[in-house]
């Protein structure tokens, strides 16, 4: 039996609209939803959308958010193939010894 690695990931689906003027009337053009990492409020999602280059020229307004959490699973050997090794930060005791 293969060893598996599991991780719960929370993401937010933001519903977007772009305001347009047509025949003197303001209309909302509904855009494709965008997935953002984390559990974001409408305000937080709006800040993230404003940072994206595809919305610099034609800004979009976040009209709703839907957070979702799912459990993902990956075989450990596949994870090790794709993962990068990260150095652990030095413990406080080790830092104190180096400074002494």
UniProtKB/Swiss-Prot annotation:
Molecular function per GO: DNA binding
Disulfide pattern: none
Gene Ontology BP, a term: chromosome condensation
Domain of life: Viruses
Key word Ribosomal protein present: no
Function (record text): Histone-like nucleoprotein that binds to the viral dsDNA and responsible for wrapping and compacting the viral DNA about 4-fold. Forms a nucleoprotein complex in which the DNA adopts a right-handed toroidal conformation winding around a protein core. Binds ito most, if not all, the viral genome, although with different affinity, the highest one corresponding to the genome ends. The formation of the nucleoprotein complex at the genome ends, activates the initiation of viral DNA replication. The binding of p6 would recruit the complex formed by the TP and the DNA polymerase to the origin.
Family as reported in the entry's similarity comment: Belongs to the phi29likevirus histone-like protein p6 family.
Name by which UniProt lists this protein: Histone-like protein p6
Organism whose genome encodes this protein: Bacillus phage B103
Protein's gene: 6
